[in-house]
Amino acid sequence: MIEIFLAERCPFCVKVRVFMEQKGIPYVLKPVVLGGATSVVKEELIRLGGKAQVPYLVDPERSVRMYESDDIIAYIEEHYVR
């Protein structure tokens, strides 16, 4: 299942979250708190992507990882929206 790292007040994250919910695409939410103390989820984000930037998508079924809300939405649109 797709995992998406999102921060609560990030407008780009809201854009991805709203898109996923409108399209009914299931995903695992990985909540990230930016600017605060390092958390296990934030450490995982940095380990996987190399930086603490959100939104960040991980699709283990296709071995795809990416940043950038527009790229994430285009990817989901191409591979998961029916």
Residue ranges, per PLM feature:
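GST-like domain detector, emphasizing the conserved glutathione-binding G-site
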Residues: 1-8, 14-82
